[in-house]
């Protein structure tokens, strides 16, 4: 976000703030992130796109720029969010994927993880899975789907919902990994949700 604001401020010669559809925790990479910004004057979208991609770092790319109504807000208008968490299960760590997946280095009981995940789908108070103990706002969220896919050397957990708390996906994933390691019972998710304390969930 800071890099985008820096380049836009340089282009417009004004202090610019953007609103993203969602924040990303440390170590999280955004794909197809939507952001909105109010500019004082009318700019050609193609000119903005070209300028930003010319001056942004190589690991950030703006795919498209479109004019929207004055009322549009990327975060408030977001219909849903999707997180994909990759877990490496092969013994040897991949040097090419080290920034994009968590290396566990062991096989997991995926069927047990899927059973546990079913109890997390729906509208619940996810306070147990919130990384911010001082959270004052509601910790109720809706997860519409959790898909767990297994390939030869990787497990991918895809969470879809209306929004996620700070570190919620990491904590959910850490908990499901413990289920896959048989360190936690697959049927324990309802009890965990009722606990309302972070210390009872998995490590991250």
Predicted regions and their residues:
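Structured-RNA-binding interfaces characteristic of tRNA pseudouridine synthases
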Residues: 1-204
């Amino acid at each position: 976000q800071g890099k985008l604001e820096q380049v836009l401020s340089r282009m417009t010669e004004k202090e610019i703030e953007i609103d993203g559809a969602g924040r990303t925790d440390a170590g999280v990479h955004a794909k197809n992130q939507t952001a909105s910004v109010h500019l004082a004057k009318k700019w050609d979208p193609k000119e903005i796109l070209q300028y930003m991609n010319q001056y942004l770092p190589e690991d950030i790319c703006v795919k498209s720029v479109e004019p929207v109504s004055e009322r549009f807000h990327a975060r408030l208008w977001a219909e849903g969010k999707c997180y994909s968490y990759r877990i490496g299960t092969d013994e040897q760590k991949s040097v090419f994927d080290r920034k994009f997946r968590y290396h566990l280095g062991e096989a997991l009981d995926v069927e047990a993880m899927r059973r546990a995940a079913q109890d997390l789908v729906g509208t619940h108070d996810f306070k147990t899975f919130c990384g911010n103990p001082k959270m004052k706002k509601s910790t109720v969220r809706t997860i519409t789907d959790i898909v767990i896919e297994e390939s030869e050397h990787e497990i991918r957990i895809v969470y879809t919902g209306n929004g996620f708390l700070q570190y919620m996906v990491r904590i959910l994933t850490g908990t499901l990994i413990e289920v896959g390691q048989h360190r936690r019972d697959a049927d324990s998710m309802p009890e965990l949700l009722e606990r309302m304390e972070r210390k009872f969930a998995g490590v991250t």
